[in-house]
Structure formats: C-alpha cells, structure tokens
C-alpha cells in the first residue's frame, strides 16, 4: 500500500493530466508500485519543479521531473466489443 502523502501527490499530478485530457491515476499508481526508483523521484521532486505537457501528434501525456521524462502514450482502437485504449509508459533519463 502506498503512503497517503504519495497518493495525494499522485492525485495532484493526475489533475494536471486530466486538465490536458486524460485520467492517468491508475497508471501512475501502477508505475510507482513497479518502479521504486521512479517512486523515489516523484516523492523527492518538488511539485513546482515538475512540468506537464501533451504531445497531440503522438497522443502522449508527459511528466518531466528534474532528471527524467515519463511519457504515457495512449494507443486507441476499436474491435468487435467497441472502442478500447492501452497506456504505454516510457521513461527517459538525462
């Protein structure tokens, strides 16, 4: 279980993504659960130093931390059951 402080930060981060057009809360929680290094970076980066953007062409939602960029690429499609989407997360360190 994630700490309440981290969950609040994830909700705040997600509000930015919602404002850009997509709810990524579940994907953010999954990411910090699977990647301790990313969890530590999110916990230790001040919110004011984070930046958020959307790449319309690639349908990606981007979170920039001080030393890495996390992009959530949205893949959409439709099949016999109707529309679907998948989120792919990519991390670049600099």
PLM feature spans:
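N-terminal trafficking/processing presequences and adjacent post-cleavage segments
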Residues: 1-38
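Acidic, low-complexity, intrinsically disordered interaction modules
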Residues: 26-93
């Amino acid at each position: 279980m994630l700490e309440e402080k981290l969950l609040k930060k994830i909700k705040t981060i997600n509000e930015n993504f919602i404002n850009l057009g997509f709810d990524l809360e579940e994907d953010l929680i999954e990411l910090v659960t699977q990647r301790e290094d990313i969890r530590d970076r999110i916990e230790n980066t001040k919110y004011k130093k984070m930046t958020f953007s959307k790449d319309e062409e690639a349908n990606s939602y981007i979170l920039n931390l001080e030393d890495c960029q996390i992009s959530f690429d949205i893949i959409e499609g439709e099949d016999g059951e109707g529309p679907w989407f998948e989120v792919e997360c990519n991390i670049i360190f600099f």
